[in-house]
Regions:
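Formylglycine-dependent sulfatase
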Residues: 1-483, 487, 496-522, 526-532
Length: 532
């Protein structure tokens, strides 16, 4: 009998992808081939109302702790921390000691803990918060938020705007093998940890944090070739095709009005050469998602080979919505890309290129929702997610509102570990959603529970069916026509695409939500930057 099945506790595999669109997987309406993920979804529950932070590091902080990111040292990303926030409690830039991570809790309860991929929870020397120090017995990690997917940015000369990429194996300095592909490499490292622990009878907690499909857009040429003819009609056509498929799958009601596309240039205004360039970018992006699916298939096979697959609970989600920032024309990336990247058409997708998908493709991926990564609109914080395996209903779907803070308490409950607060540590704000996963409950959060967001000058708050958002002025760099620096109000039950602002029609409801947001801000210690 495999050692994992000798006891009663489940193994866990949490897979986090980076900047992936809500409809990229074919099981969510996309055209990209994702058979391995689709098979896991068919064996589990599709989570269609899962929410995160608008940006990656803050989402990861909440996943790891079950707490709001402002409470645990990650009030914002170090890369965009303002002078007003620097030195303030909650803005340390690494996971602070006032909270226990899910890896620490599981390790202390007898789990073997391992991770491979993106860390981004302490990117500044002396690296006060590294994977091993925060509960992972084995780890191979990128410390920062992005990197060249082939390892081509590990020196001062080749490092991009964030400097040379920094890697740690079990918290010790290590180099990424030049020419290896990040998605394959991280999957192989995790499988290697499986093999190293084949004689270890302890249950496992495995965390696989892909850096794909985060820019730069890079993928093996043979995979890019599979999609070179797929996107020649442009993002608007892709958006309509995905929406139609979502309706067939029951992911969007026929009455759902999709958000209006904002920013960027309409396809028909581009020259043939510009269209060809854009189509290749999206082909590379699709290849990144395809490669990620293929890597997941290898990890799942590793679980099967070890006899642990049937005992494993798998959770999968994207850390935020797709990225619509056109980095080629946006500081601080613009000047570096112009000076260092080779973005000729035939080179896009290779090690020496650096491109991004931009706002039009991103809104095809986030449809029917409003906007994308960085913003508190649904397109930025409502992400593709599912659960599969032990303790999860099969061929199911849940529309229950779920939050990334719910993952840690859910794993603790499934492991039979008391979720009660540890002495000297913060209590978790998230709730266990185990009942939603196994189909015994339809909701996890109370209908009137306050859910709030704050990041990078942006704000958001949800009460019941109502949601108010406050978009920062930076959105005007991408889409000047989008209202900024004022509160917008939407009824998500009637208008999930956030298409109709009801702020003027419902001033009392808006004030109720704004008051709720300021109560949240005081509670978690938000430092609102000057000019926000």
């Amino acid at each position: 009998m495999p050692s994992s099945q000798a006891g009663s506790r489940p193994d866990f595999l949490v897979i986090v992808v980076d900047d992936m669109g809500w409809s990229d997987l074919s099981a969510f309406g996309g055209e990209i081939d994702t058979p391995n993920l689709d098979a896991l979804i068919a064996r589990g529950v599709r989570l269609t109302n899962f929410h995160t932070s608008p940006l990656c590091a803050t989402t990861r902080a909440m996943f790891m702790t079950g707490c709001d990111h402002h409470e645990v040292g990650m009030g914002t990303m170090v890369e965009i921390r303002t002078p007003e926030q620097t030195g303030k409690p909650g803005y340390e830039g690494y996971l602070t000691g006032n909270v226990a991570t899910i890896a620490e809790r599981l390790r202390d309860a007898g789990y073997h803990t391992m991770m491979a991929g993106k860390w981004h929870l302490g990117v500044e020397p002396p690296f006060r918060s590294m994977p091993r120090a925060r509960g992972f017995e084995r780890s191979w990690a990128l410390m920062q938020g992005e990197h060249n997917h082939y390892g081509g940015d590990q020196t001062v000369e080749t490092g991009s705007t964030h400097g040379p990429s920094i890697y740690r194996a079990d918290d010790q300095p290590v180099a990424f093998p030049l020419g290896a592909y990040s998605t394959d490499f991280f999957a192989e490292r995790l499988i290697g940890f499986f093999e190293d622990a084949k004689d270890d009878a302890r249950p496992r907690f495995s965390y696989l944090a892909f850096t794909a499909p985060h820019s730069p857009l890079q993928a093996p040429e043979e995979l890019v070739a599979l999609y070179l003819d797929t996107y020649n009609e442009g993002p608007e056509a892709l958006r309509l095709k995905r929406l139609a498929r979502m309706r067939v799958l029951g992911l969007a009601a026929g009455s759902t009005r999709p958000a209006e596309v904002r920013g960027g240039q309409p396809w028909e205004t581009l020259t043939p050469e510009e269209q060809q360039l854009q189509a290749r970018k999206m082909a590379v992006y699709a290849a990144m998602v395809y490669a990620m699916d293929r890597a997941v298939g290898r990890v799942v096979e590793g679980l099967r080979q070890s006899g642990r697959y049937d005992n494993t609970t798998i959770m999968f989600f994207s850390d935020n919505g797709p990225s619509g920032t056109p980095r080629e024309t946006t500081p601080p990336w613009r000047d570096w890309i112009a000076a260092k990247a080779d973005n000729r058409l035939e080179n896009i997708g290779r090690m020496t290129s650096y491109t991004s998908i931009g706002p039009r493709w991103a809104q095809a991926q986030s449809a029917p929702f409003f906007l994308f990564k960085r913003y508190t609109s649904e397109g930025g914080v409502r992400t593709c997610a599912f659960a599969s395996g032990r303790g999860v209903a099969s061929r199911a779907e849940s529309e229950a509102f779920l939050h990334v803070m719910d993952v840690a308490p859910t794993l603790l409950e499934l492991a039979g570990i008391d979720v009660a607060t540890l002495p000297g540590k913060l209590p978790m704000r998230g709730v266990s959603v185990a009942g939603v996963l196994d189909g015994t409950r339809t909701e996890a959060h109370a209908p009137d529970e306050r859910i709030a967001w704050e990041l990078a000058y942006g704000r958001g708050v949800k009460l019941g069916d109502w949601k108010a958002i406050y978009l920062p002025a930076v959105i005007h760099n991408i889409a000047p026509e989008v209202p900024a620096k004022r509160w917008l109000l939407f009824n998500l039950a009637r208008d999930p695409g956030e298409t109709t602002d009801l702020a003027a029609a419902e001033p009392h409801k808006l004030q109720e939500l704004v008051d709720a947001w300021f109560a949240y801000a005081r509670e978690v210690g938000v430092v609102v930057p000057e000019g926000a």
